[in-house]
Each structure stands twice: as structure tokens, then as C-alpha cells.
């Protein structure tokens, strides 16, 4: 499954992880066609974007000063769509702090599921 990572510099990584997870959990509650699986606690988060797109995002806010994002998709098109969704939301939520998301190849550590969430 193709995957990419991003390290987003921020003084408030836990805040942005929580906002992302709460936003998509709220979307799931409000729209029956967007039943995302969302889990988060202790500086880690997970969003499964099915049925909108076959892909997911894992987040880690445990490292000081950085929000680590790891996205995957069933194929390259799904990966690209998940990246666009996540980037758009992180940059919108972090507009006041000037957050930007730049994707690169996934590290082996992230691709092995070290988050301890689904």
C-alpha cells in the first residue's frame, strides 16, 4: 500500500491532532455518507477515510515541536487524495500559525504501524 509522511513544525502538535480527529469524527456523526473511523488519545491519532477514499492517516504529536502525519492509500490515486484532504485541513486549521504540509516517502518506522492504533 503506497504511503507518505510529513513532519509539520508546530509548537502545538497535540492541538492540531485533536482538531483533526474531532473534525472528522464530527463529520462522521453529521453525514451518513462519511462514516470515518476515528481514534485518538495520548498524542496519537488515526483516521480511516473510507467510504470517501480507501486510505487513512496516522498522526503522532508526542515529539516536541512537530506533528508527524503518515498517510496511506489503496493505490497512488487514493494516496494523493488522502494527502490533499489532510493537507487542506491541517493548513486551514493552522493558518494562524502558518502551518504547511510537505509530503515525502514514508519512513519504515511509520509504515510498520508504530502508533499502536488501528
Task: Show where each model-derived region lies.
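Beta-strand/loop substructures that line and gate deep hydrophobic ligand-binding cavities in soluble
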Residues: 53-73
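C-terminal structural segments of small proteins and small subunits
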Residues: 70-106
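Short, low-order "capping/linker" segments at domain edges
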Residues: 104-118
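Amphipathic alpha-helical segments
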Residues: 13-29
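Ser/Thr-rich, low-complexity intrinsically disordered terminal regions
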Residues: 29-55
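Extended Gly/Ser/Thr-rich low-complexity repeat segments
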Residues: 22, 26, 59-64, 80-92
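A generic structural signal for beta-strand entry/edge sites
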Residues: 3, 42-46, 64-68
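Terminal, regulation- and interaction-focused segments at domain boundaries
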Residues: 1-16
Amino acid at each position: 500500500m503506497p504511503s507518505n509522511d510529513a513532519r509539520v513544525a508546530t509548537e502545538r502538535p497535540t492541538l492540531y491532532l485533536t482538531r483533526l480527529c474531532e473534525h472528522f469524527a464530527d463529520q462522521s456523526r453529521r453525514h451518513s455518507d462519511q462514516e470515518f473511523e476515528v481514534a485518538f488519545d495520548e498524542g496519537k491519532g488515526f483516521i480511516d477515510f473510507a467510504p470517501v477514499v480507501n486510505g487513512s492517516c496516522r498522526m503522532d504529536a508526542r515529539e516536541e515541536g512537530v506533528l508527524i502525519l503518515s498517510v496511506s492509500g489503496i493505490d497512488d490515486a487514493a494516496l494523493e487524495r488522502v494527502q490533499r484532504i489532510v493537507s487542506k485541513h491541517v493548513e486551514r486549521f493552522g493558518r494562524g500559525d502558518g502551518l504547511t504540509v510537505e509530503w515525502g516517502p514514508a519512513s519504515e518506522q511509520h509504515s510498520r504501524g508504530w502508533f499502536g492504533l488501528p
